[in-house]
Every structure is written in C-alpha cells, then in structure tokens.
Amino acid sequence: MFANPHPGTLHGEQVGVATLTASRLQARILALETLPPLQVRRIDDEKIRRMHGKSGDEMVKVAHGKAFDAEATRVMNERLEREWPDLRSELLEIMLPLEKLLAAYAASGTPSTAGGLGIDPCFYPQAVLNARDVRDRWTILDLAGDLGLLEEFAEHEE
C-alpha cells in the first residue's frame, strides 16, 4: 500500500500494518449475513495516473484488467447471493482472528498502525483506497470497493 519511500519504516513493517488492515476489512465483510450488491466500477484513469505517478499507466491497465463489466457484475451478484452463506461460514472457520494477530504484534513490539510507524495519518487512508490498483488479482480491497464499502472503511484506518 506504500508506493513511495517512508523514512524510518521498513517494508516488512509496512506489510505488517497492511496485513492488519486487510484482516479488519475481511472481518467487517464477513460480519455481513447478506452482502450489498456489487456495483460496476467506474475507473478514473486520470486519478489513477496522478496517484501512482510513473507507474500510473500500468496501474490503469491493472484496474481495467480486473474490473467486472455489467454482465460479469450481474453474474457475480447472482453467485454471491447463492453462495455467500456457505462461503462466509467456511471463511469464518479458517480466518485467523484479528485479536490474535494484534496480540502477536503487541508481544513482539511490532507497530500495528501506520501511525505507529510514524506515517502521516492523512496518507494511510488514501493508500488503502489506491492499493486496489497495484495488483492484478481481485482482492478483498476490490470486493470492498465494488460493494461500496471501501471508502468508509478506509477513512477510519490510521
């Protein structure tokens, strides 16, 4: 989630914070007995280019490459409506609880927030929002974004 260097932080620490963010987001989505419908993503190419600088053109390709069109969104919504209860149950069984992760971080003295790494609190929510364009895999960030849940979630991340 951190595209630019952040003095005083190590990549592994950044990955650790991002892991907790993903765990919180996953827990929030798995708490939903029914999902809101996925929406077709409207991709703002120019915004992606601005946010990702010299990697912007590649990130635009990534975003478009994994975005669902209207038909794929309709099909996925039908599938999620049909399969969500079983999928949710299965994921809840195997998900490592956030509390266990937080306890391990605390026991090892590992920072658990971007603020704990000394990163500007205004930066991290934007990093969470823009991270979905970095990988060509459809991730929990894409699910949350397409469900309309990512922006509200990200604004509370620190």
Predicted regions: what is each one?
Residues 32-158:
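C-terminal charged capping/lid subdomain of soluble metabolic enzymes
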